[in-house]
Amino acid sequence: MINLRKTHPLLKIINHSFIDLPAPSNISAWWNFGSLLGICLIIQILTGLFLAMHYTSDTLTAFSSVAHICRDVNHGWLLRNLHANGASMFFMCLFLHVGRGIYYGSYLYKETWNIGVILLLTVMATAFVGYVLPWGQMSFWGATVITNLLSTIPYIGTTLAEWIWGGFAVDKATLTRFFAFHFILPFIITALAVVHLLFLHETGSNNPSGINPDSDKIPFHPYYTIKDALGLMLLLLMLLLLALFSPDLLGDPDNFSPANPLNTPPHIKPEWYFLFAYAILRSIPNKLGGVLALLASILILLIIPLLHTANQRSMMFRPISQTLFWILTANLITLTWIGGQPVEQPFIIIGQLAPMLYFLLILVLMPFAGLFENYMLEPEW
């Protein structure tokens, strides 16, 4: 009998992607995050779909519709908690996935990497518009502050900001269009994720050693399906612990108050996963300069392949680059902490030094470390 999964036009694609896919035999748990991000996306789309059935995108009823979901809808509280904390798990996996890519030199698959950066930006946009929907105090003021940054663009800035708002301030029109964007963007993310996989399967996976693994491949199923299943169990365990025991741990208490344009919260701050970028934005005492630094902090990922100077792909055998990588990690954690602090000393000076170190590490120190390691490995030395 002909094996259907190898001949059927649709099943054949699935077979070549998840079953008979030749995978390197030595990829570690750091390679689990791709599949975990796929699971996160599915969870977010499903919980979001059911939430959208009960949510109303109107300034008068948005806040009360979220309260209604939590109080009156069957398991509505669970859907909302899974969706809100699912976003946190999504970003946790995203940051680890990007970190893995930088550490092991996966960015040298340039097409896959560039699509990945576009995916990251799209997910960030989705999370931002989604945060506005409950129409709490921090939702409203977060939307006001961030969309206001568009006004820094020369000549067209103010017009552009008002066009996005659909008026002269964040209001009903803004909320309605943000809901529309929040609904459509996850499907765009799904399409981009398929393209991301398409480019990945053109080259095959990288591996911890950074050496061409063609001489030693194993089938994806059952080896990596079972490994991904373990990752999935741990992800679900963490998500359920968060959503069931401390669902509001990562949220902002200000969002329990309905949006009030006449009352500004003392400290406006985004969700934890944007704090590193927010700290970079605040570090420059100039509106346009801050916006450019904010953009540069994310878009710098696009030029990382051009800054690769080492003869080895992975950092596995490069201790100096490893040290700088972990300093960069500590620096990002510091930025996340600073982004949530009030604008006063000593946070101001730390918040100005940390972004300088961030750009210095990526643009100067890490490329020079690669060159120095090449020099140290020369046999004549």
From Swiss-Prot:
Binding site for heme b b566: H97, H196
Residue numbers binding a ubiquinone: H201
Entry annotated with the keyword Transport: yes
Membrane topology: Multi-pass membrane protein
InterPro entries: Cyt_b/b6_C, Cyt_b/b6_C_sf, Cyt_b/b6_N, Cytb/b6-like_sf, Cytochrome_b, Cytochrome_b_C_euk/bac, Cytochrome_b_N_euk/bac, Di-haem_cyt_TM
GO biological process terms held by the UniProt record: mitochondrial electron transport, ubiquinol to cytochrome c
Description of how the protein assembles with itself and partners: The cytochrome bc1 complex contains 11 subunits: 3 respiratory subunits (MT-CYB, CYC1 and UQCRFS1), 2 core proteins (UQCRC1 and UQCRC2) and 6 low-molecular weight proteins (UQCRH/QCR6, UQCRB/QCR7, UQCRQ/QCR8, UQCR10/QCR9, UQCR11/QCR10 and a cleavage product of UQCRFS1). This cytochrome bc1 complex then forms a dimer.
Task performed by this protein: Component of the ubiquinol-cytochrome c reductase complex (complex III or cytochrome b-c1 complex) that is part of the mitochondrial respiratory chain. The b-c1 complex mediates electron transfer from ubiquinol to cytochrome c. Contributes to the generation of a proton gradient across the mitochondrial membrane that is then used for ATP synthesis.
Stated name of the protein: Cytochrome b
The organism of origin for this protein: Pseudantechinus bilarni
